[in-house]
Amino acid sequence: MALENPKMHNSEISQRLGAEWKLLSEAEKRPYIDEAKRLRAQHMKEYPEYKYRP
């Protein structure tokens, strides 16, 4: 979406993507949720001492 609309603000992109996400069924969301879990586990394994500090 950002590539298609390079002048669009990040907040607008986030709102639109959030709206699209809500329209997806659980089955359509599942691959993304599974990939997020896999990446989270990989990150925890590679960086066990990491703590998020904003």
UniProtKB/Swiss-Prot annotation:
Its main location: nucleus. It holds the Pfam family HMG_box. SUPFAM superfamilies: HMG-box. Transmembrane segments: none annotated. One of its GO terms (cellular component) is nucleus. InterPro entries: HMG_box_dom, HMG_box_dom_sf, SRY-related_HMG-box_TF-like. It is found in: Nucleus. Residues 1-54 bind DNA. The keyword Hydrolase does not apply. One of its GO terms (molecular function) is DNA binding. Signal peptide: none annotated. Keywords: DNA-binding, Nucleus. This is SRY-related protein CH32. It comes from Gallus gallus.
